[in-house]
């Protein structure tokens, strides 16, 4: 029985890994296509019909390129940096619930004895804390990359990115704390299930927390208008200036993986997660499939938002970035935590009725 469970978990993990890599590959293609649309050009259209094999061609190119190591680099740390970034990006997916419970296929039930499949690898009681911890650890990969490359542009990019991510983790954490106060749980499934009747963004504290969270989300993923770590006009390509071939591909994959992860987290925290509007399909055997479909649609919207903002807004100056984080975002984050506390007491206990 134990071996059967291990096999079932292995199949689930490998399936998720395949879906993640495929999704990230075609997310890069979608961004290049949208960039072409914005710039009035067709975008990638040579590798297969409509360019659908472009991600495969890019993958072969990265793998086939020669691995070059700059002189005087700390080789062990130099190789460790992209590994840390990629590992953290993958580990974050372990606690994301993509839907409810699906009936297992007959062949899987026969093979392992498992009758149902939870659309989540693990469901710890502190799923939100796990996500925040993993996002904090990813800073090490960027800082080590900047330091170990023995390049001034890389080092400046690493220092910038570290300061930026630490600065914006605080308001992001405060906005998430507001949601935790309102829902009363750190489990992502509980937070999603608590929004069956009303999404968190429709509540006054949730509405304010959403805008704080989304702003911090762009800074955390080093995307425009907050891509100060990779400012091409200033730092070549920032902390991965000295990286090429497969090592650069790991950083590239980690960045796009983090964008999709943040889109999933936004959906779970503010937009009901996998819950279906108006309880469509409630009680049917297809409810989990319907929930998964709605979850994917919500995630695709926020994934598109990353692309849209990149080709719409200009880059901040570094001093403006720091000023926004410490003088605006953190005070607003503290305010929304207090606001959520007062709102939750009123909503659950009705104490404010005493004063009306």
From Swiss-Prot:
* Gene Ontology, cellular component aspect: plasma membrane
Top-rank taxon, per record: Bacteria
For biological process, the GO terms are: aerobic respiration
Where does it localize?
A: Cell inner membrane
Stored PROSITE patterns:
COMPLEX1_ND1_2
Enzyme class comes to translocase
Provide the GO MF annotations for this entry.
Answer: NADH dehydrogenase activity; oxidoreductase activity, acting on NAD(P)H, quinone or similar compound as acceptor; quinone binding
Q: How would you describe this protein's topology in the membrane?
A: Multi-pass membrane protein
The EC designation for this entry is 7.1.1.-
- Per the UniProt record, one Pfam family is NADHdh
Residues passing through the membrane, by range: 4-24, 79-99, 127-147, 166-186, 198-218, 251-271, 289-309, 329-349
> What is this enzyme's catalytic activity, as reactions?
a quinone + NADH + 5 H(+)(in) = a quinol + NAD(+) + 4 H(+)(out)
Q: What keywords are annotated for this sequence in UniProt?
A: Cell inner membrane, Cell membrane, Membrane, NAD, Quinone, Translocase, Transmembrane, Transmembrane helix, Ubiquinone
Q: How does it assemble?
A: NDH-1 is composed of 14 different subunits. Subunits NuoA, H, J, K, L, M, N constitute the membrane sector of the complex.
What family does the entry list?
Belongs to the complex I subunit 1 family.
**Described function:** NDH-1 shuttles electrons from NADH, via FMN and iron-sulfur (Fe-S) centers, to quinones in the respiratory chain. The immediate electron acceptor for the enzyme in this species is believed to be ubiquinone. Couples the redox reaction to proton translocation (for every two electrons transferred, four hydrogen ions are translocated across the cytoplasmic membrane), and thus conserves the redox energy in a proton gradient. This subunit may bind ubiquinone.
For this entry, the protein name equals NADH-quinone oxidoreductase subunit H
Whose protein is this, by species? Leptospira biflexa serovar Patoc (strain Patoc 1 / ATCC 23582 / Paris)
